[in-house]
Amino acid sequence: MKLGSKQVKIISLLLLDTVFFGIEITTGYLSHSLALIADSFHMLNDIISLVVALWAVNVAKNRNPDSTYTYGWKRAEILGALINAVFLIALCVSILIEALQRIIAPPVIENPKFVLYVGVAGLISNTVGLFLFHDNDQEHGHGHGHSHGGIFADHEMHMPSSHTHTHAHVDGIENTTPMDSTDNISEIMPNAIVDSFMNENTRLLTPENASKTPSYSTSSHTIASGGNYTEHNKRKRSLNMHGVFLHVLGDALGNIGVMLSAFFIWKTDYSWKYYTDPLVSLIITGIIFSSALPLSCKASKILLQATPSTLSGDQVEGDLLKIPGIIAIHDFHIWNLTESIFIASLHIQLDISPEQFTDLAKIVRSKLHRYGIHSATLQPEFITREVTSTERAGDSQGDHLQNDPLSLRPKTYGTGISGSTCLIDDAANCNTADCLEDH
C-alpha cells in the first residue's frame, strides 16, 4: 500500500474520527450536553461510512474476476458510493426532524463557550480530512483530442492499401476519454473480450501495430479544422471517494454552524438567540442534501447501466452509420462498468462480405475509442442481397424502406423483438415474455 493511496487516506481519517468520537461522547455525557452527544453519533455515522468506503476500495482492488464475478469487484466502489449517499440523505432527514423540533421548542444551551471549543476542535479534525480528500474530489484529466475529418466518409475498401492515422492536440478543444485512470481494462476483462486496449495517452495506431490496421484508404483521415469533435468532460474522481469527501465536508459545515450559533448565543442577549442553532442546521442540511442527492443519482445510473452522461447514444450511432458497409444498428447498449470504463455491445447489419468484417470492425473500434469506449462486442449480420445506395445512406430505422423486406427493423436500443429482421435473433435470443411465462 503506497503512501497517498485511497486506503491510507481513509484509514488516517478513520483513526482521527474514532478518537474524536470517543472524546465527544465522553465529554457529552460528562457535561450533560445533548448537542455534543448528538454530534458524536453524527461522527459515528461517518465512521461507518468510512468503513464501507475502505471495504469497497480494498475489494475493488484485490478481488480478481472469477466464474461468479466475471467483471471482478470493480463496481464495489460504486456500491459504496451509493451506500454513503443513502447514509447522507438519511442523516439530512434526521437533522431536519431534530431542527424542526428545536424550532418549536428551542433548548437552552447552558455552556455555549464549551460547545464553541468543541466545535473548533471538530473543525480542525475535519479540515485535515478535507485536505486528505480534496485532491481525489477535484482531480481531472488532461485534454487529448481525436478527430477524423470526413467521419470516414472517404474510406474505401481496398485490400491491401496503406492507412494513416494522425492524432493531435487541438487548441481550444478538450476532447478527452474517460480511461485515464489506474484501472487497466485488460485486468478487468478476459482477453476473449478485450483483444487489446489503448488508453488516451497512447497512439491508437502505434508503429508496432501499424501492420494490424484496417486496409482502408483515406484522403481525409487527419485532424483538421471543422472536423467532427466529440467532447467528453472527463472526471477522474471516484464516486466512492467523493462520498467520503461529502461526509467530511458535511461535518466541517456542521462544526462551523455549531461555532457560529454557540458564539452568537454566548455573546448576545436576544430572546430569540436559541433559534440560531436549528436555523443554521437547516441551512447546512440543505447544502449537504444538494450534494448527496446527485451522488446517489450518479451511482444509481451506473448500477442501472444507463448510457454515460458524457455520451449521446444517438450521436454514436449516427457516427457509426456513416461507415461504408454498415446498413443498420440495433440492440445497441453503452454503459459504465465504473466511472472511468465504458463498455458497448451492438448488432450491425452489413452489406460486405464476411472476409471484410475484421477490417470494418477495426474502424468501428477506432470510432468507439474516440468516444472513450474501449471495450465493445460487435455482432455482425450479413445481408445476403445487394443493398442500394439509398438503403446504405438511411438510418437504422429509415422510413424510406417501408416497402422493402428490411423495413421491419428492430429498434436501435433494447433487445431483439419478435418479428424483427435481426438475422440472428431466433438463434441467439429468447422471447423474454414467453420464457418467463413458461417458468
Curated annotation (Swiss-Prot):
Region spans: Disordered: 207-231, 388-408
InterPro entries per the UniProt record, alphabetical: Cation_efflux (IPR002524), Cation_efflux_CTD_sf (IPR036837), Cation_efflux_TMD_sf (IPR027469)
One annotated GO molecular function: zinc ion transmembrane transporter activity
Highest rank taxon of the organism: Eukaryota
Catalytic activity, as annotated: Zn(2+)(in) = Zn(2+)(out)
Phosphoserine modification, residue list: 225
GO terms under biological process: cobalt ion transport; intracellular zinc ion homeostasis; zinc ion transmembrane transport; zinc ion transport
Residue spans of biased composition, Basic and acidic residues class: 388-402
Stretches of the chain found on the membrane's Cytoplasmic side: 1-9, 55-76, 135-244, 296-439
Crosslink (Glycyl lysine isopeptide (Lys-Gly) (interchain with G-Cter in ubiquitin)) position: 301
Effect of residue 45 to I: Increases ability to transport iron and decreases ability to transport cobalt
Motif (Histidine repeat 1): 140-144
Pfam families registered for this protein in UniProt: Cation_efflux
Record membrane topology: Multi-pass membrane protein
Localization in the cell: Vacuole membrane
Bilayer-spanning residue ranges: 10-30, 34-54, 77-97, 114-134, 245-265, 275-295
Disulfide bonds: none
Alphabetical keyword list: Cobalt, Isopeptide bond, Membrane, Phosphoprotein, Repeat, Transmembrane, Transmembrane helix, Transport, Ubl conjugation, Vacuole, Zinc
Function: Vacuolar transporter that regulates zinc homeostasis by mediating zinc transport and storage into the vacuole. Plays a role in resistance to zinc shock resulting from sudden influx of zinc into cytoplasm. May also participate in the regulation of cobalt levels under normal physiological conditions and may be important in the supply of metal that is required for metalloenzyme or cofactor synthesis. Involved in the resistance to cobalt and rhodium ions.
Domain notes: Contains 3 histidine repeat motifs between the 4th and 5th transmembrane, exposed to the cytoplasm, that may be involved in the binding site of zinc.
Similarity section: Belongs to the cation diffusion facilitator (CDF) transporter (TC 2.A.4) family. SLC30A subfamily.
Note: Present with 2070 molecules/cell in log phase SD medium.
Protein name per its UniProtKB record: Vacuolar zinc transporter COT1
Species assigned in the record: Saccharomyces cerevisiae (strain ATCC 204508 / S288c)
Gene name in the database record: COT1
